[in-house]
Structure formats: C-alpha cells, structure tokens
Amino acid sequence: LNYQLSPSFEYQSDPWFTHVWKGVNGTPTKKRAIGFKKLAKAVKFSTKLMGQAMAKRVKATILYATETGKSQVYAKTLCEIFKHAFDAKVMSMDEYDIVHLEHEALVLVVTSTFGNGDPPENGEKFGSALMEIRHPSSNSAERKSYKVRFNSVSSYSDSRKSSSDEPEHKDNFESTGPLANVRFSAFGLGSRAYPHFCAFARAVDTLLEELG
C-alpha cells in the first residue's frame, strides 16, 4: 500500500534538467552543442576582461607583525574585505622588501606590541628600516636600542596628535618626503595594562607620516 497524505510537500527535480525547449511549431528543439574551441575562447576572453578590471584597481599592501598569530588573522580578514574593491595582498613584515615601500599606493599595517613596547620578532627588521630612513645615522654610538627608540616615537605621537587638535594647527601642507605618494593606515593590537600601549603600532604610524 502507498499512503499519501494531503496536503503535503513533494520533492521534484530541478526544472532546468527536465524542461524541454520547444520551437514555434511546438516541436522540441535540439540543444546547441558547444565545442571545446568555443569554450576555450570564452574562458580566455573572460580572463582577459577580469585581468583588465583588476589592473584598474588600486593596489593595497597589508603588512602584519605578530607573536601569537592574532595580527595575522586580522590582516587576512582585512585582505578578504579589501579584495572586493582593491587589488590587495597580505604579507609578513619580515618578508617585505622595504625598497618597494615608496612605490606603494596604499599600505595597511596590522601589528601588535610585544612586551614593554617592543615590536614583534617579525616586525623588528621593518621597524628598524623605517627608523633608519627617518633618522639616518652613521655613528653606531648614537644609535639607541629599538625598544627605546620606538617608545620615544610613540610618546611623540601622542603629543603630536594632541597638538593637532588645536585650532591653530594647519593640515594644509604639501608633503615632500620619500613616501609622499603613499597612503597608509596603522591598526595596533595591545593591552592598556602595559605602560607603552600599542607603542610599535603608534611608532610605525608616526614614522610613515613623517616620511610622507
């Protein structure tokens, strides 16, 4: 016996698999066979269009420095979001060649601060390179440790931002630094339980602004 309750919901196959296209006279029409050559041309054409569209997008480089991997997760999430409108890529600071920095259009920095104002291990090279570009010194005796230097830059960043809130502060000026054409933003992860809160992120933000 086959009992069927009514009303009921019945499963049916997808209509695009079972529908039969009919011509003017009501007779079934034959499906158009697409050859491999035509399909390959269509794929090549669509790839070319996508390449042209991607070439017009602004390139965005996302740099991260981390000790625990949290900043890397944030950086990858940020990259996925920016890929909707930018030609974005993400990489660690120790893998980035600082020589390419002045040719970037948009740089996004995601970094934590390790310990008492120290940069993460994979961010030391990048931070030191920025510091040397901003404050070149041939005398090794005059060079302070990166910890002291980044903390001092971070403290200067706080005083600079507080002074920029004053009415007489002027924002209209023409930048002539080596990174004048680079747009940037820095996002820091840290805890206010430490005296130097997000010191490395603030230092990178300040150095990029001074160089641009």
UniProtKB/Swiss-Prot annotation:
Question: Transport as a keyword?
Answer: no
The record lists heme b as bound by Y11
Q: Where is the composition biased (Basic and acidic residues)?
A: 158-173
Q: Where is the Flavodoxin-like domain?
A: 60-212
Q: Which cofactor does it need?
A: heme b; FAD; FMN
Where does the record place the region Calmodulin-binding?
A: 30-50
Q: How is the cofactor bound?
A: Binds 1 FAD. Binds 1 FMN.
Q: Which residues bind FMN?
A: 186-212
Q: What is its EC number?
A: 1.14.13.39
State the UniProt keywords alphabetically: Calmodulin-binding, FAD, Flavoprotein, FMN, Heme, Iron, Metal-binding, NADP, Oxidoreductase
- Known Pfam families for this protein? Flavodoxin_1 (PF00258)
The superkingdom of the source organism is: Eukaryota
A GO MF term: metal ion binding
Q: Which reaction does it catalyse?
A: 2 L-arginine + 3 NADPH + 4 O2 + H(+) = 2 L-citrulline + 2 nitric oxide + 3 NADP(+) + 4 H2O
Q: Where is this region: Disordered?
A: 155-175
Its function? Produces nitric oxide (NO) which is a messenger molecule with diverse functions throughout the body.
Family listed: Belongs to the NOS family.
Q: What is this protein called?
A: Nitric oxide synthase
UniProt organism field: Squalus acanthias
Taxonomy of origin reads: Eukaryota, Metazoa, Chordata, Craniata, Vertebrata
